[in-house]
Amino acid sequence: VEIEGELLGIGALMEFDGYGEVKRIFVHPKSRGNGVATAILNRLEREARSLGLVAMKLETGTKQPDAIALFEREGFVICDAFGDYPVGDPYSVFMQKKL
């Protein structure tokens, strides 16, 4: 997200077999709490849908309650570890949203 040439936040979606993984969402500290992360996540979801993906998945840290709350507000639910992530990682939260 960029406004008047100022970068407020970034995000990335990596395509896998049938799903997209949200790889990063970062919002500049001075822009947090203004809907920037939601806008980025919504843009990534539109991209996933345009690619014909059936789900979006992500991994975030257990000590990131604001991120977890954002993802839950946007329809993500807790899921099992996926891809190359280790099962039982005590520091990770895995989430997915069916599209």
PLM region spans:
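Acetyl-CoA-dependent GNAT
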Residues: 1-23, 28-30, 41-43, 47, ...
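Structured loop/turn residues at beta-strand edges in well-structured enzyme cores
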Residues: 6, 51, 77
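Residue-level signal for short amphipathic helical patches enriched in basic/charged
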Residues: 17, 51, 59
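Short coil/turn segments at alpha/beta junctions that flank glycine-rich nucleotide-binding fingerprints
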Residues: 34, 50-54
